[in-house]
Amino acid sequence: MTKKLHIKTWGCQMNEYDSSKMADLLDATHGYQLTDVAEEADVLLLNTCSIREKAQEKVFHQLGRWRLLKEKNPDLIIGVGGCVASQEGEHIRQRAHYVDIIFGPQTLHRLPEMINSVRGDRSPVVDISFPEIEKFDRLPEPRAEGPTAFVSIMEGCNKYCTYCVVPYTRGEEVSRPSDDILFEIAQLAAQGVREVNLLGQNVNAWRGENYDGTTGTFADLLRLVAAIDGIDRIRFTTSHPIEFTDDIIEVYRDTPELVSFLHLPVQSGSDRVLNLMGRTHTALEYKAIIRKLRAARPDIQISSDFIVGFPGETNDDFEKTMKLIADVNFDMSYSFIFSARPGTPAADMVDDVPEEEKKQRLYILQERINQQAMAWSRRMLGTTQRILVEGTSRKNIMELSGRTENNRVVNFEGTPEMIGKFVDVEITDVYPNSLRGKVVRTEDEMGLRVAETPESVIARTRKENELGVGFYQP
């Protein structure tokens, strides 16, 4: 009988990537098939996130539901991974003794051995160590699920912002070698992937090793990925202003595969609050980056992260944030009320902004961002946009849906063979959360590049001299 695996994922795109790798790994080693129904599963895995408020309590609430399943089926294996697991460790078993496996983001590749250990002697396993790059070396080949894919290029963060748990739960920055990344992307391209999203907690800090032992920059990597035939769009998430160097901006100037959309968190428009947050940049420095980006790519649209009600934030500080929002003309944002994360320096600060004031500031900020986003959408009315068709529309299964370069969802009438390909669509209607249009050109008329083999991608980045010694050539 087929063994079943159920994974519940909370949090960021990195967690989504990790969960997909868990599924591929346990399919390869144990033959587990994914199921959306927890009651059917032989193994339940909870991939957690510690960014939001009351993250720990949310975990134990979910585990309480799964405990009932374990009581009915004592052989059921329950595992907790992700950032809450890394943060809480053995404390999870103290509150939920029925949990069999606790693993961190850097030890998910050891899941097969952990499951074997639990199956063998029923003793629980806790592994929340940070074994650096080993995780990527032991994962199976990537498996495409549609025309878009996430590819993790690095883990961890060295910035230690005062409100953030990432350095404590995912460790410090570790970059994958460039060859490993390029080979994975080429494998995905060969399976029909057209758009890759390069992932990292601080993705533009990537400093991976090249095959010849030299250290590459993020700008180098972007150009190498753009050269892979079949990959027509590149996104990356999430970047830090302090690492947004001029060579990255130059890639926007000369590399059309890099989309005209950037998520660049700023958190606040007040230098005083930024200093309290440990952000190491000013609002003016942030605006200087945006100014240079728009000189290189005039149509680029920017999204960001904001925290309102940070300890010590005054009305004047908040007004400076609102001014930054207007000056940059952000297209969208992920914005939240401050809530202290245990173990961070900000948790020891006096949370002196009244809750109602926090809510009011968040409402004002989000309303302004929504107005700006709608203005950006209205500018697209009557224009022709290139859409990567991802599948059928959620609103109408008789229609197709895809995304523009600037991350707008567009619904339109089309045929099934368009799925996974690009189409040019004239935008005819604008709505708060989506656009509507009509197809004016199909991919057959675009002359796009055809995917090449992964081996040829690696070979193309190298060239041998007369002695047969390879050297790097982008």
Swiss-Prot record:
Residues 378-441 form the TRAM domain. Residues 3-120 form the MTTase N-terminal domain. It is an enzyme of class 2 (transferase). One of its GO terms (molecular function) is N6-isopentenyladenosine methylthiotransferase activity. Residues 143-375 form the Radical SAM core domain. The keyword Protease does not apply. Its EC number is 2.8.4.3. It catalyses: N(6)-dimethylallyladenosine(37) in tRNA + (sulfur carrier)-SH + AH2 + 2 S-adenosyl-L-methionine = 2-methylsulfanyl-N(6)-dimethylallyladenosine(37) in tRNA + (sulfur carrier)-H + 5'-deoxyadenosine + L-methionine + A + S-adenosyl-L-homocysteine + 2 H(+). [4Fe-4S] cluster 2 binds at C157, C161, C164. Its cofactor is [4Fe-4S] cluster. Disulfide bonds: none annotated. It is found in: Cytoplasm. CDD domains: Radical_SAM. GO terms for cellular component: cytosol. [4Fe-4S] cluster 1 binds at C12, C49, C83. Binds 2 [4Fe-4S] clusters. One cluster is coordinated with 3 cysteines and an exchangeable S-adenosyl-L-methionine. Gene3D superfamilies: Methylthiotransferase, N-terminal domain (3.40.50.12160), tm_1862 like domain (3.80.30.20). Keywords: 4Fe-4S, Cytoplasm, Iron, Iron-sulfur, Metal-binding, S-adenosyl-L-methionine, Transferase, tRNA processing. Pfam families: Radical_SAM, TRAM, UPF0004. It comes from the Bacteria. Belongs to the methylthiotransferase family. MiaB subfamily. Monomer. NCBIfam families: miaB-methiolase, MiaB/RimO family radical SAM methylthiotransferase. Catalyzes the methylthiolation of N6-(dimethylallyl)adenosine (i(6)A), leading to the formation of 2-methylthio-N6-(dimethylallyl)adenosine (ms(2)i(6)A) at position 37 in tRNAs that read codons beginning with uridine. This is tRNA-2-methylthio-N(6)-dimethylallyladenosine synthase. It comes from Salmonella enteritidis PT4 (strain P125109).
